[in-house]
């Protein structure tokens, strides 16, 4: 069988596609991906065999190409980084194709943290964007906030099943109902980050209640304070 790659193409802007991923995409024969993801790399895939998929029909495309791949190279592009919020799909690709080379990309998590000036080494990163139950992740969110960490979070859009829908408004209500004073909690919500349609809400968690955001949203709870090396003079002073 030919080579199979799972690659991250960044949050949405072609400027955030890494050079190694560009090279892999340009040299491949077949691509299987979502419309939004393929749009990010559209200038690199002209003339390729392309399968545009949805969550409902992706399995059909993987199974179709499996016996037809031969010695050709297949690329499955992912928005952001392959290693974040995509493990269920990557696991399935490994089950189907066996050897899959994973190439990371720049995540919306990284960009959102940078936009909000929140260092990841003082933050907890949580994704609710999974199909498995998220009750433990909700508790993880509470604990991180109580412990004083900033939190960079990917919410879960599931409008067809309200009990699973956990977007910024639902998260704000959840935190308030669990004893947090959301009127004093600072938060950013970025939508379509790095693209021409990027938006940034900045305010309190309380203000999120009743607001609608797209499925391309990332939240940043900002509890960071400046703590430079000048607070640790012992490193160079005798």
Predicted regions and their residues:
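A short acidic, often aromatic-flanked loop/helix-cap motif at beta-alpha or helix-coil junctions
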Residues: 56-62, 108-109, 131-134, 194-198, ...
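Generic domain-boundary/flexible-linker signal
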Residues: 42, 61, 85, 134-136, ...
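Class I S-adenosyl-L-methionine
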Residues: 1-103, 110-111, 208, 217-218
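Generic hydrophobic alpha-helical segments
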Residues: 61-65, 140-141, 171
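A contiguous loop/helix-start segment that scaffolds small-molecule binding in enzyme catalytic cores
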Residues: 2-6, 145-238
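Structural motif
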Residues: 33-36, 54-56, 79-81, 129, ...
